[in-house]
Structure formats: C-alpha cells, structure tokens
Amino acid sequence: MMEMVLPVANATAAALARVSAVFNAPLARAVVFGIHIDGHLVVEGLLIAAILFQLSRKSYKPPKKPLTEREVDELCDDWQPEPLCPPIKEGARIDTPTLESAAGPHTTVDGKEVVNFASANYLGLIGNEKIIDSCVGSVEKYGVGSCGPRSFYGTIDVHLDCESKIANFLGTQDSILYSYGISTIFSVIPAFCKKGDIIVADEGVHWAVQNGLQLSRSTVVYFKHNDMASLASILEKLTHGNKHTEKIRRYIVVEAIYQNSGQIAPLDEIVRLKEKYRFRVILEESHSFGVLGKSGRGLAEHYGVPVEKIDIITAGMGNALATDGGFCTGSVRVVDHQRLSSSGYVFSASLPPYLASAAMSAVNHLEENPSVLANLRSNIALLHKELSDIPGLEIASNILSPIVFLKLKTPTGSAVADLELLEIIAEKVLMEDSVFIAATKRSSLDKCRLPVGIRLFVSAGHTESDIFKVSASLKRVAASVV
C-alpha cells in the first residue's frame, strides 16, 4: 500500500513546486498603472470570475419523466414502513379487569360483585347522594363543560367558589384549580423550577412528580426514601462552600403520604431543615388531603406545623373528595404566578363545573361529619392488625396511612419475578374470593427505586366484614404462593 502512495505524494509535491515557481517568476509578474501584480493575484482574479460565472448560470433541471405504473408498484412493494410505536414487551402487557359500576367499597368487576380495595375512595363518598345532587344541579345550570381554558372564557363562578372553599378550609391565602389531578404536580413544578435550579427530592416519589422534575430541567438530587439524615447530608453538601448558593432557587419536593410505599413524610423535620438551609418546600398531598389531621386538613395539621411554612401545596381531588381535578394552594403570589406560567392551567380546558361543585360538597361533608375520619382510621388499624402475621409478606406502610402497602419479606432479587408473584396473589384473591386488589405494576418510564408490592386502599365505607374478608383471603393465598 505504501509503495503506491509514495509515488503519488512525490508527484503532487513536484507539481505544486512548479506552479509556485511559475507564479513567482519575473515573467509571471506585470506592472499595470504602476502597480506590481504578482501571479497569485491573477489566480485570485480567475477564481472570482469562475464564481461569478457559476452564480449567473441557470440551475440545472433534470427532465421530468414520470414513473411508469410498474415502477410505482415496485416502489410500493419494496417500501417497509417503520412501526408507529415499538412492539409491546411481554412484561408490559396488562390485562386489566373491567369495572361495570362505580368504584365504591363494593363494585362489579367482569360481571362479578366484589369487595373493592383497589380504588382510592378514602372518605367513602363515591355514590353520596348530596354530592350527586350537587353535580346534577351544576349540569343543569352550566352544562357538562366550560369549552375553554380558564383565561379564555373558561372561568365560571363555581371555579372561584371552589378555590375559595379550599383556601379557607386549609387556612391558606389562595388556591388554584387544575383540570386533571395528575397534571397538577407536574405542571406546578416546572412553573417554579427552571434550568439551573436545584431540587432535592425523595427517591420514592410517584411518576407524576418524576415527570414534573424532568420537565423542569432543574438539577435533581435524590435522597433516601423518608430518611432525614440522608436529606440533611445532601442539603449540607449543596450549600456548604457554594458561593452562588444564595442566587440559585432551591426546593425540597416530597409527598405527604407516598403512593409507592404508604409512608408518611416527617414534615416537622423537613421544615426544620428547610429553614436551616434556606430551601423552599413543595408538598404533594393527594393521599393526605382529607385524611390526615384532626379535621382532615392534611400533613400540616397532623404535625401541628403552620401551613404558611409550606411554600407550595398540591393535591388531586380524586382520592378523598370523590371527584376529579386537582388544586395548588399557598400565598397569593404563588397562585397568581401559576395563572400565567403553569402549562396545565393555561393550556387546558377548565375543570367541568359539576366536578368543582362535587369538590365543594365533599369538603362540606367532611366539615359536617368529622366522624368519617374516625371510621377511616378504625378500618386502617383493623386491617393492620389482621395482616400483621400474613405469611411471606409484611406491611411497609404507616399505621395512619390509608394506603396499606404489602411487600415481600424475602424478595427474589428480581423486580420482574417479585411482581409476577404479587400479581398471582392479586389474581387468585379476585378469582377465588371476589376481593379486588392490585399489585404496583410500573411502566418503563417510572424511575421509582422502591420495591414493588400490593397496595390496598382503605375506605371509611368499608365494613368490618370487608376487612376480615380481604385479610383472610390474602393470608390463605399468600401462604400457597409465596
């Protein structure tokens, strides 16, 4: 190979030397109007002339010759389109049961009456007559939808009434409604957190929070699940010796009750660390609003922390209030900022008026019937007691959480294998004992680092016999499977 390259290189070098000698020779120089013109100027002039010639030429257009029918058919036969989406992996396939009635404490699944522990209906308000009547009245007055975003003729008086009702109930300055519960948190986080900001989040946050963190494009650091020592260590590292720390917006993002574990966040300790290291707190209360606290006002009431010490509170209204949509509450400044900067508020059609009416009726019911909270806590305690000795499984959730989370005592070492065992248990419980429960199946987009498990949603509408039935069924099936 080298024997072929060397002669070519030598010949090229010799040719370049001759060209250089020619243009530097006296014959290649001229005097025009007293100005000496070297050979390289002649070459540059020729290049300019060539460029102008090329620019002035008309573009070449190949002759238009249409394809024959045979050629068209051949091209169509050879074309292999890419699939619109990748094929579904076997582990991602879900054969979901079909509900044929409202998802109350008792429902119909695939034509069979079952006890329902798979739906979040904490206060047992699904099917409540007063809430249904308020929805009917709202539909008769406003119709079923607003047909526009809040800023474009989508605001109806019932929206403003609901926002005021929630703010007054929680003791905050103002609140703002969102059309869809899960979109609340992943619209609020990007509205306040931008590129260059720092977010410290619990590693166990659910997918909607994860999505908000990703959309914010902020620098996200995770601390160990519900571990305040881990949180304090990370806050110390982020602030110690950082000269620009005062110029960077910093947030702590946690859930009041974690959907992926049923654990309760220690808000008093989080607020102490927040004030020490000068962070802001975004608290997601979808599973604690209407549940925790003496009167159901959430995590702040549960710990006795002044609500104004929490910068931003969000919650979905589908778990305790038996409606849909979500809200964010806090100071007037926090709420007003979202009316122009939150994508889920600005670009979505507003919450249907009848759902806002249902939310207000549910809050009124909670205020007028505080005993519903006692019923809920009694059911949670009873279920914990009955499942304390379940074979092969253990309770990982807090005693006050309406999410009773069961995980394997001895994991297999593979999340896929663990999930298969849990799904077998859930399927057997449904088919053999007519008890509807669900395993925590996660998509490939969910980056939660916690173990999978079986999640039971306890309702104030469940009876003691319901609790005994699900406990006995789970014990029997778990003993045969695990």
Swiss-Prot record:
Pathway: Lipid metabolism; sphingolipid metabolism. It is a single-pass membrane protein. InterPro entries: Aminotransferase_I/II_large, AON_synthase_class-II, PyrdxlP-dep_Trfase, PyrdxlP-dep_Trfase_major, PyrdxlP-dep_Trfase_small. Keywords: Acyltransferase, Endoplasmic reticulum, Lipid metabolism, Membrane, Pyridoxal phosphate, Sphingolipid metabolism, Transferase, Transmembrane, Transmembrane helix. Signal peptide: none annotated. It catalyses: L-serine + hexadecanoyl-CoA + H(+) = 3-oxosphinganine + CO2 + CoA. SUPFAM superfamilies: PLP-dependent transferases. GO terms for cellular component: endoplasmic reticulum; endoplasmic reticulum membrane. One of its GO terms (molecular function) is pyridoxal phosphate binding. It is found in: Endoplasmic reticulum membrane. It comes from the Eukaryota. Its EC number is 2.3.1.50. GO terms for biological process: ceramide biosynthetic process; sphingosine biosynthetic process. The keyword Transmembrane applies. Its cofactor is pyridoxal 5'-phosphate. The keyword Transmembrane applies. The chain crosses the membrane at residues 33-53. Serine palmitoyltransferase (SPT). The heterodimer formed with LCB2 constitutes the catalytic core. Belongs to the class-II pyridoxal-phosphate-dependent aminotransferase family. Heterodimer with LCB2. Component of the serine palmitoyltransferase (SPT) complex, composed of LCB1 and LCB2. This is Long chain base biosynthesis protein 1c.
